[in-house]
């Protein structure tokens, strides 16, 4: 993740062939969108898959979010992330937001991701709601470990998805052996 205004992206983000990462997430607030677009274009030109994580959308005016989404839609970003930075959104808000993001993303050949925080213990519910609305990349961490109240718990998400390509048992084993006292 590269936060707008917090890194020297032209120097810090190496060309893809010299790096161990494949994706750059540009984290931004709506008022920083022009700088975010510059970072997106720079990372894309260096060979990365690039997403735009528009943060703090629960504190953002709808018109400002619409303008930011329009800017990302016109950029070379591969994806747009719904980011509930403060864990303040309810499932019905995620539903509307996911529909808006998905409509814009599909019209512009992009995917949508979800990054939820757990301040109201809704990160899991909101991630599931986003998935039900067509969001394809779902962020989760072991035991929900993350900033503040944490994120969506990976072990819950993997169990819920019931997809045979996902095996929750190695995650549970890691948690038991390395995270629990």
Predicted regions and their residues:
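Catalytic cores and adjacent flexible loops of soluble metabolic enzymes
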Residues: 1-181
